[in-house]
């Protein structure tokens, strides 16, 4: 076979949303450009960082890389979604600006999607790393055991279960999506938390399949001041609770993912209880009673979902 006759790798779009992390960003970008899968476009979405990373990125001299810099902060979710909407590849993946890939990340995951047209998301195991890039062995073992314990390599049909219930697909940086399978314009741009859950919901509602590779091909960095740490305050916990309550309610009401309804109801009530507790801590019993009545009227708390919650607990 002549070189010109070799099959052409389909284009993969890599989106890196970034804000004020120039050093980590450069590490993430280099891990993308070092991929053995060469046919990719890398779109760095800078969300109005104090220091413009464009000169640093341009100096890398790679034509596959382009930078989109917003003149104002448009929010984390909007930054991710607009990047995905700009993508032109057959496949798209979102890498955190502080996360890293093994050089074979794309070469291991994308061919499985090419070979299996029904697969809309391909994902792998991942390591947790600290601020200095050291692997957190205990955390890595715990997360993979909790979400992927016993999961076999190969194609799996139930994205509702793996993406939303067991949360086996729990890190965007460790997953690749078929771009045209995801309805990107359905993602609420003001979503404060749970972007990964929402993308997996959109993948699940296609009724298609996913592929799992148990190799640790991605590294997810845990930082002291990550967005998840905002939930430590009462205000942050209430915002987190309301946001999550809202999207679990969306999932619950969607017939396309009906197999997960008992679990979605539990998660909805779990977050409603979190909102209720925050209101009690902030404003006292009278305000929390009003909140309780409002949540009951909205259907966020029901006896059935509370019974399920008591039986199965948190996941």
Feature-to-residue mapping (PLM):
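A conserved acidic beta->alpha catalytic loop
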Residues: 38, 46-55, 72, 96
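Acidic helix N-cap motif at the loop->helix transition within catalytic regions
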Residues: 50-59, 100, 104
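Conserved nucleotide-sugar donor-binding catalytic segment
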Residues: 147-233
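Glycine-rich, basic loop-to-helix element that forms the pyrophosphate-binding segment
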Residues: 53, 70-87, 97-100
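Catalytic core of nucleotide-sugar-dependent glycosyltransferases
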Residues: 192-195, 205, 216-224, 229-260, ...
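Conserved donor NDP-sugar-binding/catalytic core segment of glycosyltransferases
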Residues: 104-141
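N-proximal low-complexity "stem/linker" segments adjacent to membrane-targeting elements
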Residues: 1-33
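Short aromatic/hydrophobic "clamp" motif used to bind/position activated sugar donors
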Residues: 92
